């Protein structure tokens, strides 16, 4: 691999809830993803789309998270702490949260002008 163990975790949080302190939530979820993937927070990218038009069974708040990384994903171990984080920080119940995990091939992810593989 070109960049050693840098795996560039990415998380995209879409929610129908309105988030007051977006920067704080982005920093905290970056720290969480860094911890769960065992990667430096320096390489975690986080995106937040709040107050989105979303519907999941009814009009109560819901959340959809996309998590991508070159390796370092363990969905069965990561799902619960991520759902708990969303519940604690935003108040969305676990049964109103979907998470999509994607292990991206190193040849399909680039940073700093070059792919990782």
Labelled PLM ranges:
Residues 1-7:
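Short, Lys/Arg-enriched N-terminal segments with co-localized hydrophobic residues
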Residues 7-117:
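Interaction-mediating elements
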């Amino acid at each position: 691999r070109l960049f050693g163990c840098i795996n560039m975790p990415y998380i995209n949080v879409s929610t129908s809830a309105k988030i007051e302190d977006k920067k704080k939530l982005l920093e905290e979820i970056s720290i969480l993803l860094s911890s769960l993937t065992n990667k430096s927070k320096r390489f975690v990218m986080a995106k937040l789309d709040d107050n989105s038009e979303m519907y999941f069974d009814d009009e109560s708040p819901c959340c959809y998270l996309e998590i991508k990384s070159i390796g370092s994903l363990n969905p069965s171990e990561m799902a619960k702490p991520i759902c708990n984080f969303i519940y604690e920080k935003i108040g969305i119940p676990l049964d109103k949260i979907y998470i999509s995990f994607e292990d991206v091939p190193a040849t399909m992810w680039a940073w700093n002008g070059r792919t990782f593989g």
